[in-house]
């Protein structure tokens, strides 16, 4: 079960070193799995009802799914030898909706999503099309990864 989607999951796991980031990835037709990492550097800033973040860096080599073979396939599809990190270059939001720019596998794309601040944590959700990042045709014995994946991330705020 190869999943380049987990690559994106790792990238958007916007958390600090102390928190663990998770991303939900949907497989077709097998169901869902989660990719997790705590190797994320950066944080978000909250001022009133506005939030912002820059240069959130996720080390994709440390993304884990709980299945060693799937982890290896993820590394392959994310091409972590050449692109070891995913980066949220910039993001801003107001009133629970936000936009940003990310880089995965050397490709930069604009994103949009929703968020909420809970205490000292910003929780965000957004969708990505992994084909936009050159991750295509992931399939093993009839089981593939959807091109559209949903990322759920948590980021510490200051």
Model-identified regions with their sequence ranges:
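Positively charged n-region of N-terminal signal peptides that target proteins for export
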Residues: 1-5
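Acyl-CoA-dependent O-acyltransferases
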Residues: 7-10
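Sec/Tat signal peptide C-region and signal peptidase I cleavage site
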Residues: 12-18
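Low-complexity, acidic/polar, glycine-enriched regions of mature
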Residues: 18-158
């Amino acid at each position: 079960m190869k999943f380049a989607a987990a690559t994106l999951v790792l990238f958007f796991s916007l958390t600090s070193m102390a928190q663990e980031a998770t991303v939900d990835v949907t497989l077709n037709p097998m169901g869902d799995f989660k990719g997790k990492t705590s190797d994320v550097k950066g944080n978000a800033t909250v001022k009133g009802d506005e939030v912002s973040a820059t240069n959130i860096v996720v080390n994709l080599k440390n993304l884990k799914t709980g299945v060693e073979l799937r982890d290896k396939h993820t590394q392959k599809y994310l091409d972590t030898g050449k692109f070891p990190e995913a980066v949220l270059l910039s993001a801003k939001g107001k009133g629970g909706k936000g936009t940003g720019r990310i880089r995965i596998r050397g490709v930069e794309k604009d994103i949009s999503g929703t968020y909420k601040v809970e205490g000292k944590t910003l929780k965000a959700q957004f969708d990505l099309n992994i084909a936009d990042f050159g991750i295509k045709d992931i399939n093993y014995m009839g089981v593939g990864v959807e091109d559209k994946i949903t990322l759920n991330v948590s980021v510490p705020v200051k």
